[in-house]
């Protein structure tokens, strides 16, 4: 996990948010349709017109995150991603203002650029021009509040998002939007585990997901690759055929006999049937080759 610095993209984010709000604005009633504090508002914002074009907001989020999942750092593909609201669309608490403040108190970015949708809905806009002056957007559609996450599936591309679903609508300290995340998130190359220091109760469930055996195996492998040769051309490694993958694993495990490598890692080479699914999955996590292992 790393700090997602959205600041260089703020102008583009606000331009897309303003465009959507202006399209929803009815000058006769001086109101928005659909209302900004409804699920239909986000549903409309997610339509192809706003989200999927080359200049759409999905591509913008991918640029901001360098095509990486905001949680596990897997390389993102448009066919296998989901959108994460840092401040959930539907705050499942009695006092939404208190819950909202828990996020903004911990992230200056959210405090400066996002407004609770129910508060925004009470604002009075006399004209379309008034919308152009907005600098805090309703949290359901504020791009400042949106991140991209992977689908969390290891064996096949499918809908849904494991990372996202692990969190649901529960409060989660917005570490990805906090510069100090680099010091707080620690990956252990020996066990493959990820931990947060100091511990944070809101992350317990998410860390259980991120410490799934497959995630840990992948981190262990990347730590071994990093230890073996930090000057490798990973793009060349990515294209290795099965025979070269086997030789590569023998090197990183320092074994002359492939059978001496623990069985759980064999699948990452493509054995026994030449299936490259797990090899490709491993390569999707090449961010860990650049991680400063401790």
Please provide the spans of the model-predicted regions.
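Short, intrinsically disordered, charge-biased short linear motifs at domain edges
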Residues: 51-60, 133-140
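A boundary/linker detector
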Residues: 1-56, 75-77, 91, 292-294
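Long, low-complexity, intrinsically disordered segments enriched in glycines and aromatic residues
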Residues: 137-139, 144-151, 155-221
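Short cysteine-rich loop/turn motifs with clustered Cys
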Residues: 54-81, 150-157
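C-terminal/domain-terminus segments
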Residues: 4-22, 165-182, 265-289, 293
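C-terminal, charged low-complexity interaction regions
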Residues: 195-294
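Histidine-centered nuclease catalytic patch
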Residues: 74-148, 157
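Generic structural signal of hydrophobic/aromatic residues within well-ordered alpha-helices
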Residues: 21, 41, 57-61, 96, ...
């Amino acid at each position: 996990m790393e700090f997602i610095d959205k600041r260089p993209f703020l102008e583009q984010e606000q331009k897309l948010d303003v465009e959507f709000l202006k399209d929803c604005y009815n000058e006769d009633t001086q109101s928005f349709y659909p209302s900004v504090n409804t699920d239909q508002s986000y549903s409309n914002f997610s339509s192809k017109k706003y989200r999927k074009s080359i200049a759409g907001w999905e591509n913008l989020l991918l640029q901001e995150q360098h095509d990486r999942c905001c949680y596990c750092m897997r390389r993102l593909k448009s066919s296998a991603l989901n959108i994460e609201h840092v401040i959930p669309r539907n705050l499942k608490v009695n006092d939404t203002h208190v819950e909202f403040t828990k996020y903004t108190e911990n992230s200056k970015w959210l405090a400066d650029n996002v407004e609770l949708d129910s508060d925004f809905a009470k604002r009075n806009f006399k004209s379309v021009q008034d919308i152009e002056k907005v600098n805090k957007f309703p949290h359901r559609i504020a791009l400042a509040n949106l991140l991209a996450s992977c689908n969390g599936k290891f064996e096949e591309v499918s809908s849904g998002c494991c990372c996202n679903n692990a969190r649901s609508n529960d409060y989660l300290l917005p570490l990805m939007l906090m510069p100090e995340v680099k010091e707080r998130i620690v990956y252990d190359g020996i066990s493959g585990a990820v931990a947060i220091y100091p511990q944070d109760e809101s992350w317990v469930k998410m860390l259980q997901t991120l410490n799934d055996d497959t995630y840990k195996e992948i981190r262990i492998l990347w730590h071994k690759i990093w230890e073996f040769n930090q000057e490798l051309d990973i793009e060349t490694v990515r294209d290795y055929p099965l025979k070269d993958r086997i030789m590569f694993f023998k090197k990183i495990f320092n074994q002359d006999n492939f059978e001496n490598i623990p069985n759980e890692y064999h699948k990452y080479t493509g054995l026994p049937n030449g299936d490259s699914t797990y090899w490709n999955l491993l390569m999707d996590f090449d961010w860990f080759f650049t991680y400063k292992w401790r």
